[in-house]
């Protein structure tokens, strides 16, 4: 989760988030090199006395500034397309969870189990226990097994919402009448927080998401107790 005064991204918990962080560093390095080159050329123009007022064309320069940006775009596009494919591809999910956005709460249905569904509301500030996080705790957490591919089917009952958990690299729009999907795979157990990331009305800020990732054995015990 995020901390006060934190700089940078949240710690990666899923393979997709690890890839996104690597891509962020890769792209940031390219941007840094381009910015350094541009600043160097600007400083050179301001300090040098060499001018070329009679130059009408420069084929070599035009070729370079056409080919070089194309190469840079390819270097950015290829890893980006690879990650997009990874985020969209779901191979043999062991579990499917249907997520519905409402004003202003989430409802979850474990489609592989009978009668395993619940609503998830934010816990009001005056009902929080010591150590719980303001505006982030819910009455019913989403319990999921770790190290297994899980498919989330995401939609909405009313207006646009967005189901987002930054540590897992997840952000999927919840659109009325449309079913979007996302892959959840956690590398380690823990509790991970997210929020609705699409302005959906006056209580948009009060739609937290809490995932509790646990080993498969404990998940089976929990699901048995819930059904």
Curated annotation (Swiss-Prot):
<feature type="topological domain" description="Mitochondrial intermembrane">
    <location>
        <begin position="1"/>
        <end position="14"/>
    </location>
</feature>
<dbReference type="InterPro" id="IPR045187">
    <property type="entry name" value="CcO_II"/>
</dbReference>
<protein>
    <recommendedName>
        <fullName>Cytochrome c oxidase subunit 2</fullName>
        <ecNumber>7.1.1.9</ecNumber>
    </recommendedName>
</protein>
<dbReference type="InterPro" id="IPR036257">
    <property type="entry name" value="Cyt_c_oxidase_su2_TM_sf"/>
</dbReference>
<keyword id="KW-0460">Magnesium</keyword>
<keyword id="KW-0472">Membrane</keyword>
<dbReference type="GO" id="GO:0005507">
    <property type="term" value="F:copper ion binding"/>
</dbReference>
<dbReference type="InterPro" id="IPR034210">
    <property type="entry name" value="CcO_II_C"/>
</dbReference>
<keyword id="KW-0496">Mitochondrion</keyword>
<comment type="similarity">
    <text>Belongs to the cytochrome c oxidase subunit 2 family.</text>
</comment>
<dbReference type="GO" id="GO:0004129">
    <property type="term" value="F:cytochrome-c oxidase activity"/>
</dbReference>
<dbReference type="InterPro" id="IPR008972">
    <property type="entry name" value="Cupredoxin"/>
</dbReference>
<feature type="binding site">
    <location>
        <position position="196"/>
    </location>
    <ligand>
        <name>Cu cation A2</name>
    </ligand>
</feature>
<dbReference type="Pfam" id="PF02790">
    <property type="entry name" value="COX2_TM"/>
</dbReference>
<feature type="transmembrane region" description="Helical; Name=I">
    <location>
        <begin position="15"/>
        <end position="45"/>
    </location>
</feature>
<feature type="binding site">
    <location>
        <position position="204"/>
    </location>
    <ligand>
        <name>Cu cation A2</name>
    </ligand>
</feature>
<keyword id="KW-0186">Copper</keyword>
<feature type="binding site">
    <location>
        <position position="161"/>
    </location>
    <ligand>
        <name>Cu cation A1</name>
    </ligand>
</feature>
<keyword id="KW-0249">Electron transport</keyword>
<dbReference type="InterPro" id="IPR014222">
    <property type="entry name" value="Cyt_c_oxidase_su2"/>
</dbReference>
<dbReference type="GO" id="GO:0045277">
    <property type="term" value="C:respiratory chain complex IV"/>
</dbReference>
<feature type="topological domain" description="Mitochondrial matrix">
    <location>
        <begin position="46"/>
        <end position="59"/>
    </location>
</feature>
<dbReference type="InterPro" id="IPR002429">
    <property type="entry name" value="CcO_II-like_C"/>
</dbReference>
<keyword id="KW-0999">Mitochondrion inner membrane</keyword>
<feature type="binding site">
    <location>
        <position position="198"/>
    </location>
    <ligand>
        <name>Cu cation A2</name>
    </ligand>
</feature>
<feature type="binding site">
    <location>
        <position position="207"/>
    </location>
    <ligand>
        <name>Cu cation A1</name>
    </ligand>
</feature>
<keyword id="KW-0679">Respiratory chain</keyword>
<keyword id="KW-1133">Transmembrane helix</keyword>
<keyword id="KW-0813">Transport</keyword>
<keyword id="KW-1278">Translocase</keyword>
<feature type="binding site">
    <location>
        <position position="198"/>
    </location>
    <ligand>
        <name>Mg(2+)</name>
    </ligand>
</feature>
<dbReference type="Pfam" id="PF00116">
    <property type="entry name" value="COX2"/>
</dbReference>
<dbReference type="InterPro" id="IPR011759">
    <property type="entry name" value="Cyt_c_oxidase_su2_TM_dom"/>
</dbReference>
<dbReference type="InterPro" id="IPR001505">
    <property type="entry name" value="Copper_CuA"/>
</dbReference>
<feature type="topological domain" description="Mitochondrial intermembrane">
    <location>
        <begin position="88"/>
        <end position="227"/>
    </location>
</feature>
<comment type="function">
    <text>Component of the cytochrome c oxidase, the last enzyme in the mitochondrial electron transport chain which drives oxidative phosphorylation. The respiratory chain contains 3 multisubunit complexes succinate dehydrogenase (complex II, CII), ubiquinol-cytochrome c oxidoreductase (cytochrome b-c1 complex, complex III, CIII) and cytochrome c oxidase (complex IV, CIV), that cooperate to transfer electrons derived from NADH and succinate to molecular oxygen, creating an electrochemical gradient over the inner membrane that drives transmembrane transport and the ATP synthase.</text>
</comment>
<keyword id="KW-0479">Metal-binding</keyword>
<feature type="binding site">
    <location>
        <position position="196"/>
    </location>
    <ligand>
        <name>Cu cation A1</name>
    </ligand>
</feature>
<feature type="transmembrane region" description="Helical; Name=II">
    <location>
        <begin position="60"/>
        <end position="87"/>
    </location>
</feature>
<feature type="binding site">
    <location>
        <position position="200"/>
    </location>
    <ligand>
        <name>Cu cation A1</name>
    </ligand>
</feature>
<comment type="subunit">
    <text>Component of the cytochrome c oxidase (complex IV, CIV), a multisubunit enzyme composed of 14 subunits. The complex is composed of a catalytic core of 3 subunits MT-CO1, MT-CO2 and MT-CO3, encoded in the mitochondrial DNA, and 11 supernumerary subunits COX4I, COX5A, COX5B, COX6A, COX6B, COX6C, COX7A, COX7B, COX7C, COX8 and NDUFA4, which are encoded in the nuclear genome.</text>
</comment>
<dbReference type="GO" id="GO:0005743">
    <property type="term" value="C:mitochondrial inner membrane"/>
</dbReference>
């Amino acid at each position: 989760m995020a901390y006060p005064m934190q700089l940078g991204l949240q710690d990666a918990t899923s393979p997709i988030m690890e890839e996104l962080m690597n891509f962020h560093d890769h792209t940031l390095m390219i941007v840094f090199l381009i910015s350094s080159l541009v600043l160097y050329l600007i400083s050179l123009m301001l300090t040098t006395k060499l001018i070329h007022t009679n130059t009408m064309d420069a084929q070599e320069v035009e070729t370079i500034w056409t080919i070089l940006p194309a190469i840079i775009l390819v270097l950015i596009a290829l890893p980006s397309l690879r990650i997009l494919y990874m985020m969209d591809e779901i191979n043999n999910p062991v579990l499917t969870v249907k997520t519905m956005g409402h004003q202003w709460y989430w409802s979850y249905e474990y489609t592989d189990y009978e009668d395993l569904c619940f609503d998830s509301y934010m816990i009001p500030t005056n009902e929080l226990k010591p150590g719980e996080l303001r505006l982030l705790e819910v009455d019913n957490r989403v319990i999921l097994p770790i190290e297994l591919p899980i498919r989330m089917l995401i939609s909405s009952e009313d207006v646009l919402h967005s189901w987002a958990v930054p540590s897992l690299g997840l952000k999927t729009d919840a659109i009325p009448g449309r079913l979007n999907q996302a892959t959840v795979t956690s590398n380690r157990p823990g509790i991970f927080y997210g929020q609705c990331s699409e302005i959906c009305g006056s209580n948009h800020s009060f739609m937290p998401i809490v995932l509790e990732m646990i080993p498969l054995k404990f998940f089976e015990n929990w699901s048995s107790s819930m059904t």
